[in-house]
């Protein structure tokens, strides 16, 4: 079902897993007649799967492989991939420790700052492997690294947050984020979610979110 947002912009109703119930009916449908494809901006994906932007889920190789399979993998721009030159060594450390040592190790690992040159390197690595470069970052990171992202081969930017609204107000002295301004200034489509109500989702899309 298409929904008109105004300014010639249309969106399609999406459903969560909990909203779907498969009930056998009196007719069946040949799978060749179905079309599960979807689009973000000018990017078309054949499989409606987006892999989570978590260090334990998506790295450069995973993102490239998911692209080849018709899906999409998102890399955490503020994770291990952009803090360390060799993220595999860090992942091996995490896998090797017990429960008692896990928290101190994670605190130590994530105390290392995110490096702009590594963001650029990971984007290039995904593209060199034929993948779609989709990266996720917080509002603060979106502001801090926007110039690097706009001058890279990035394809999609996912705005990361527990709750996302059209305007993020930061602490005094810190630059605040306005999603409408971000969407206008970013070279690539901006994706955002984690909103509960229909009204907020509509506001986000009207602000320019893909």
Q: Where in the sequence are the language-model features?
A:
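Active-site entrance/lid segments in N-terminal catalytic domains of soluble metabolic enzymes
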Residues: 1-210
